[in-house]
């Protein structure tokens, strides 16, 4: 009889660990029974067996009865090989989870038809979050355990084994007790993490406990020792039933079924938002796959699409504001960086802060363990390098263009009628600058005519070696006739290149090569403004759109059809849907003064930036009647411009002094004011000559043009909106964890990256790899390169990677099952004990790290512990349900019964179920205000909870081992 005597002051934990160690030591001294017919590691015996049976893949290591030294060597080889296989499974599971992340991120486009007939296109996620967590996510994290159970049964002539089922139960115990204990402890003191979707947690926790209760029922109550076909199939069919129940809880269908639901387009990423309310008079229709469907059709969108509740809409709005804030801060902090680089920096910060899926944390944990680096930092650094390299490539393309391009510096030129000549600049860019380039030019009439408005000009411009810019001039003819603005064209043509030029500068026709062409623009438009009229004043267009982030907007007021004299034109802003006074814009009013020959002035208005993602408000800018302010005394009389004037020093008009009319804003010295009156006009009528002069003067008076009132539409910032939209598209974790090509996968496989999980660095810059990173990389580089052959997640929307990865996991799991069984029989451990302790621990290590990272980084506890319960239920329904259904059907077809010994498994299941009730009860109690959440809390509460959960796991291992070796009676 095994006895344990320890001093009374030794802790309970130490007692348990010592007892387990003595138990395993005692096992080695038990005399092994001879190999039974069913195999070497017989489960019905109370002792382990040193006689190994042939595995599914691995043969028996002969001889069967080695010496003690050989036994230690064999056990070491099996153990190291098993650990190495666990590393391989972790890495291929990384690829598997990447494919799942890509698959569950797929979106579908739908069209919403509004009551007014307008349609809006938007996208929704195809996979419901809860459904994906219970199906693909759970399958991804538990694939080794599930496949081990199936492979063990199918590989041993459809007979029941201990390794697969015990691994599932042992893994469930490790997940429920050790992983949750770690998550509770790693949250910083004073902080808490709550489960957000508590309804889903209740459902999955209930199903998890029911799953193991059901195992006990079919093993010990319904048909003791026999698994019938209906029991196996029902176990499997509990899986979709569990998924449906969790989905119903997530969608709140059982209660909300009686509340009318309306759907509207959310402002964020085009998500569809569901909320309760009264039934509207008009129907909103939704079009899916080309068909328009009424939005209130019963259960239309439930389940087929992901409908986000109003809370999600609010979260999305906050996310947009947060993106805008991050972009502005980064722009101020890094003013020298390109916009693409700023987007990548913002992308890293947003990805670091957003809630992530279980798949992401699993991938992150595996890559940190194997020296593949922090996935977010690596992605940010890669994208930043791509942005810089693309910018450099574009610059190189321009600078290293082998073809010489010749073009005008600008496509439009303006000049006054009295300017004499207008200068046009021709640019040469690219190609070999040591060559000589020739280009012809020629003027062409538009509304202006050669000979009367401008001088016809043609010729050839020669760019000598090294020259990149030339200037040509065209003469402008002035007259005293009032005319509309006119234009003419100048064309470039016939570009040719020569490497040799004669002494006279003439092209040597024997050395012409076609390595030059015309660039854009190759035609220039020259507009001639008449200077014989005071001008017509107008805005460029009746409506203009401005971004709210413009700050100070500038609006041009054009002076066309003349530019003679000084003219004042008043302006003011008028409210529309946009409000002045600093709410949407600053009220502005004043006067513009056009000097003689000045043809354009600008009005400045300050626009207030509200940082709104969507905006459409209007106000108006209006110009008033223009006033001629400088004229001769005679012209003032002709135009009836009477009143006070001041003499303008140094100005003459046709030999006569020029006077400036006094306005309210002027404050001249009273003694300088001259009064011009029409007293002489009252005495005698105007002569015909004076009448003609008055008519001409009236024709030259400044007037308003077509657009005197400009409508200004303030919209959201185009650059800001496009940047945020681009950032939103980039903040898709599927883009981070997915791969696009085999080349990318192989580069990633042979690259060592820093494994520090430090997400506080806002720039996401990669650090140098540590010694541990290099060691883990070289230990796992074989697996990394091997699994780089798996199809990238880009193919078939992730399904190609999904299928190949699960096949590879199945193959490695078969090896793990054989290695674990051979390791156990080599040292005399039963399969059930080996599975509960070693295999369950090995398959759960990546999940442990993933949950630890999720607990510290996520805002909620769902990603760290919320999926543990669902995963445990899925393990039973898929792992045991599929395996036992296949075996039961096989034996039933042969007229036999599928026998399963209820002893060890039933005892472990019962023990786990009791402890699971305690675990869930403690977690729910921790939601009370004094602690505040399932994870974290005050240090004392954390230590007590974590210690309790670890103690439950040790007790589970201890009692399961005692029962397996018949030290206590099971079922």
Swiss-Prot record:
Residues the record lists as Phosphoserine modifications: 282, 389
Cellular compartments per GO CC: axon; axon terminus; basolateral plasma membrane; cell periphery; cell projection; dendrite; dendritic shaft; dendritic spine
Extracellular topological intervals: 33-71, 155-167, 223-228, 820-822, 894-904, 964-971
Calx-beta domain location: 393-493, 524-624
Regulation: Activated by micromolar levels of Ca(2+).
Protein residues bound to Ca(2+) 2: 417, 478-479, 531-532
Membrane topology summary: Multi-pass membrane protein
PANTHER family, per the entry: SODIUM/CALCIUM EXCHANGER, SODIUM_CALCIUM EXCHANGER 1
UniProt-recorded name of the protein: Sodium/calcium exchanger 1
Species for this entry: Rattus norvegicus
Recorded name of the encoding gene: Slc8a1
